[in-house]
Amino acid sequence: YAQSGSSTFTVPLGGQDHKFRCGFKEKKRDLTVNAGTGGSVSPSGTNSYRVEKPISITATPDSGYEFAGWTVTQGDVTIENPGSPATTATLHNDNSTITANFKSGAELVFTVRASANKIVPMPTLGSGPYTVDYGDGKVAHEVNLRAPGYTQYPGSYHTYSADGEYTVTIKGPAATAFSFRGTRNSDLQYINPCPAKSILKNTIDISCVTSLEDAFSGMKSLESIECDLFESCKGRVTTCANIFDQCTNLHTIYNGLFEGFDKCTDFSLAFHYTALNSIPANTFRGCTSAVKFNSTFSAIPNILSIPAGLFDDCVNAKEFAFTFELLNISSVPERLFAKCVKATFFRGTFRQSHVTTVPGNVFENCRAIENVSSCFENCSWITSLPEMWNTSLYPQIKTYNAYAKNCNKASNYSAVPAAWK
């Protein structure tokens, strides 16, 4: 409350009785509440309120948007929690203005190849609802991406009127699932996969995901991943086994696709039988818990080299069976496995590859190795073999049959023990 003047008055009584009446009024100020693009507010507009009394305010994002905080644009009003869409504002001395801000919701952007009048399944995402821009001028709002009857396996579909390649944008909140492999039928077999060609962007929160095993396996349509697709779940995923296994047209992946996957233990068959043109240097950066790399890059004819330091952060790695089998690589980087001091299993690691140059220190510090059978089997162009039979360097090796089978062009082939050939 406030008074119009001083609260202390001097009144000469002059020997007479006097009666005084004091008047008071509420101290009010105006609060203007505005909404930025992408949402609405309550209350809205300009209203008068008593000072020092909290006023409830609420911001509601439109479909495809999310709340991005309150800002004071005029006056001395204070907001209890500027980051919450439902909070209180308190006026003090001045008329004030506040604004609710919104931002475009998280997005998943990818391209699809479509045939005219053919149903095209969308990728599986949970939670929602979502806004889907199909790239052909049609936009669907409040899309529920759960297939009827399959509460665990969502899905959505679209029909294009003409043949072509379309860029699809899905906007929405956090997801409870993430897969382009389609929905599951009653026999738990995946059906109706999304024919995604390139995945361009993902900022949808999939932090709930802990397994990416088989997530894209067998997707013949997939050609490239050009974004940090798993950024929001990288600290939670424990396995990536078979993730892109037999994606026979996948030729390009984001550099650092698995960077920071510090809980993931298994990358076996991750890129087996794909069309990768190269292995990005940061693919396994920060993968400190990785244990298995069995057949990770096997049977990829386009790979011609292995980046130096590829496994430098994989200090707990143990298994490298057939990791680079059937590759057209000509050389192996120095000290490729030197940081993998716990590694024990190198069966068929470079089997039937075209490698010619292998440095003697490729297995440096790997004193725990137990199995090197078929490690260089049928590497018929190799010019020199790492001396794994040196027991002072590798005292734990117990299995070594066919280690150097058909490697008779190696300059030190004659020094290889007969049981290793």
Residue ranges and their predicted role:
Residues 1-8, 53-84:
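Surface-exposed interfaces of beta-sheet-rich extracellular modules
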Residues 6-31, 82-106, 216, 244, ...:
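Conserved "repeat-terminator" motif of extracellular CCP/Sushi domains
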Residues 13-16, 42-68, 91-94:
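Extracellular modular ligand-binding repeats in secreted and cell-surface proteins
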Residues 22, 54-62, 166-172:
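A short, solvent-exposed beta-strand micro-motif common in secreted/extracellular proteins
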Residues 29, 101-214, 218-219, 229-234, ...:
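N-terminal capping/linker segments that flank leucine-rich repeat
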Residues 32-48, 113-115:
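Short, solvent-exposed loop/edge segments of extracellular or virion-exposed proteins
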Residues 36, 57-63, 123-125:
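Acidic, Ser/Thr
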Residues 176-187, 210-220, 226-230, 238-249, ...:
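Core hydrophobic positions of leucine-rich repeats
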